[in-house]
């Protein structure tokens, strides 16, 4: 048995206590039972408690004809409760899973609306947590997936909070009946071709019939697994700290790790550390695709192996693991002559270059390595550029992007490489700032 519905306001306020200092609480309001109860609870609390500014957001997917009436319903409910409402229309991208595509579009809208120190509140409850655990178990999820929905996580510039995870659906229904609330029944929630609906309507009733406390037990298991995941995260932090000594190429802005520090770990600790490191950068591979990491790890020292993932690539080069995405995966285009040497020159798909100190005599232009370049070094004569790059252990993926400064056919400088990046006698150096495009998920 859950706690009586009359206790819901105090439980909700207790769960939201850590976020009372937020600038804004925004309710993800679909118009369904869960979010309707959450909205009503918070609107009532706002009358006698000091809580942040309150509003709601309704995301309209337009996936079914019935949904066209939902924004008006949500607007009427919000007006009755004196809560401002934002209706956000989104386009759902076609794909194999309509459920996932709609969720992605919805959370993209939520993320865009969540500003610094804002909190987005969603209405998932304990029954949802149990379904999530079972659904992910059937998909072969690991500890992180089986830990269920977190009570809070980062979203946009603020936070997403699920304050009803300790509340049952039965409690929400009782509260709604007691207060005469009206809510939307989404017809798609009855469509059992969707996996979650099948679990909810076909499987869960059988489990509850045999084990009445199944929802509570599964939610408790998810909590245990969250604790276990926390320990794995702590272990990953220890291992990543050992592998996070700075490289000679910090100016690249690329996330990187010392390869040897990762390779010496057990296979399980390697996967744990890399999963933790890669999670903010890319969608993680499933178990079957971790063979790509084994190929990178076990390649010979003279190789430059690459593991291609959903949102970028993991490279092994110069004794390190490097994460590349965005412009780093596009071939830079030659920019032509550099006319105003006093200003930085923007390079298509490759950041910008600039001088410090004096500026050399022009005309000058930037090229990229093609092979066969030679550089005249004071006291050393003519030296092959490939050998000079080898001496400095420049990663292979950097070599094709390094801006080379030419006067006519004479190679004057290689940006950012000490001893090659300028002329001490003439008092100038060439600096390259690679693109600061986000290295990670958006």
UniProtKB/Swiss-Prot annotation:
Positions that bind ATP: 30-35
Class in the EC hierarchy, top level: ligase
Functional note: Ligates lysine onto the cytidine present at position 34 of the AUA codon-specific tRNA(Ile) that contains the anticodon CAU, in an ATP-dependent manner. Cytidine is converted to lysidine, thus changing the amino acid specificity of the tRNA from methionine to isoleucine.
Similarity comment text for this entry: Belongs to the tRNA(Ile)-lysidine synthase family.
HAMAP family from the UniProt entry: tRNA_Ile_lys_synt
Keyword entries, A-Z: ATP-binding, Cytoplasm, Ligase, Nucleotide-binding, tRNA processing
Written domain comment of the UniProt record: The N-terminal region contains the highly conserved SGGXDS motif, predicted to be a P-loop motif involved in ATP binding.
Protein localization: Cytoplasm
One GO process term, biological-process aspect: tRNA modification
Gene that encodes it: tilS
GO molecular function per UniProt: ATP binding; tRNA(Ile)-lysidine synthase activity
SUPFAM superfamilies: Adenine nucleotide alpha hydrolases-like, MesJ substrate recognition domain-like, PheT/TilS domain
SMART domains named in the record: TilS_C
Entry EC number(s): 6.3.4.19
Protein's recorded name: tRNA(Ile)-lysidine synthase
Catalytic activity: cytidine(34) in tRNA(Ile2) + L-lysine + ATP = lysidine(34) in tRNA(Ile2) + AMP + diphosphate + H(+)
GO CC terms: cytoplasm
């Amino acid at each position: 048995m859950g706690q009586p519905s009359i206790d819901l306001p105090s439980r909700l306020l207790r769960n939201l206590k850590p976020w009372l200092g937020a600038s804004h609480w925004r309710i993800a309001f679909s118009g369904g039972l869960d979010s309707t109860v959450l909205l009503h609870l918070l609107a009532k609390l706002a009358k006698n408690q000091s809580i942040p500014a309150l509003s709601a957001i309704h995301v309209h997917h337009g996936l079914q004809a019935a949904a066209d009436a939902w924004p008006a319903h949500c607007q009427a409910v919000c007006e009755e409760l004196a809560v401002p409402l934002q209706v956000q229309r989104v386009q759902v991208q076609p794909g194999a899973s309509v459920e996932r595509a709609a969720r992605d579009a919805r959370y993209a809208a939520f993320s865009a609306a969540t500003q610094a120190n804002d909190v987005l509140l969603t209405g998932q409850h304990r029954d949802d947590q149990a379904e999530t655990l079972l659904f992910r178990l059937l998909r072969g999820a690991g500890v992180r997936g089986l830990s269920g929905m977190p009570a809070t996580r980062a979203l946009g510039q603020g936070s997403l909070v699920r304050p009803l995870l300790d509340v049952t659906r039965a409690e929400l229904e009782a509260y709604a009946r007691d207060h005469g609330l009206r809510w939307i029944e989404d017809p798609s929630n009855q469509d059992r071709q969707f996996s979650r609906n099948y679990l909810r309507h076909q499987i869960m009733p059988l489990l509850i019939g045999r084990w009445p406390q199944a929802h509570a037990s599964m939610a408790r298991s998810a909590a245990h697994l969250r604790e276990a995941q926390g320990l794995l995260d702590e272990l990953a932090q220890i291992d990543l700290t050992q592998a996070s000594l700075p490289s000679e190429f910090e100016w690249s802005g690329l996330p990187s790790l010392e390869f040897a520090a990762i390779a010496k770990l057990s296979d399980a600790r390697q996967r744990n550390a890399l999963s933790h490191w890669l999670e903010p950068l890319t969608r993680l591979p499933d178990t079957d695709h971790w063979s790509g990491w084994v190929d990178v790890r076990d390649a010979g020292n003279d190789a430059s192996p690459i593991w291609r993932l959903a949102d970028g690539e993991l490279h092994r080069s110069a004794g390190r693991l490097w994460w590349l995405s965005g412009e780093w995966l596009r071939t830079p285009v030659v920019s032509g002559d550099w006319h105003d040497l006093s200003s930085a020159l923007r390079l298509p798909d490759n950041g910008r270059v600039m001088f410090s100190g004096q500026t050399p005599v022009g005309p000058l232009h930037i090229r990229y390595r093609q092979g066969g370049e030679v550089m005249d070094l004071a006291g050393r004569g003519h030296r092959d550029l490939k050998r000079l790059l080898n001496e400095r252990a420049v990663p292979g993926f950097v070599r094709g992007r390094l801006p080379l400064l030419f006067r006519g056919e004479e190679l004057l400088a290689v940006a950012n490489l000490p001893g090659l990046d300028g002329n001490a006698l003439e008092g100038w150096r060439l600096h390259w700032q690679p693109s600061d495009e986000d290295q990670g998920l958006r």
